[in-house]
Amino acid sequence: MKLLKNKCVILAAVLFLAAGMAEGIVYMHYGEFQAQPVMLGRFLRIYPVYNDNGSWLHGRLGIGYIWWLLVCEDILSLLVEVFLIRFISALCDFFSLSRKILMLAAFGVSASAYRLFTRLRGVYVLDYLHVRGYGVFDLPDIYLFLMMVGIILWLLPYHRAYRPYKKEKVKGMPFFLKCVWELKFSGVFLRAAFLPRDRWEGLFQEWR
């Protein structure tokens, strides 16, 4: 587990630096890319634009660029991702699933950390990957997408492990008690996310 944690930290750092380098290169050649975008395929090109809304959500809601709100959102995003990593790790421990998904979670942490770094510098986000028909993105946006895809794929082995376990545990229970069991079971892992890992086994014991 410690080795995997170190790998995740290293991967997140490399991704952070890659996002910074890509943005730096695009920034240095901003005028050139604006005048003549670089085609990377039929649907993808490098075409830089500054996101003066701050984020996609702010643009959709018409909120605009509010610096302190964006910083708070990025901090909250980081905290949620750390919680999600611990929550998934606890489930992997309980069902003896592979923790390789946590490597993809490093993409999300790196994206949020880079977003926060950009906000604290007091500059607009520079988007430069234009996907035809979808919009303009940057590397951190791609990182977040990869993390979401990874979590969706992880749900497949999780569901295969969880379904027979639940079927055995709630056998013969009425519907209401099944719902109560489900809530209590979920609560175990919500608690585990806030506890040191060496206390997880004691928490899981009665649910084995």
Which stretches of residues belong to each language-model region?
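Alpha-helical transmembrane bundles and membrane-interface segments of multipass inner-membrane proteins
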Residues: 1-208
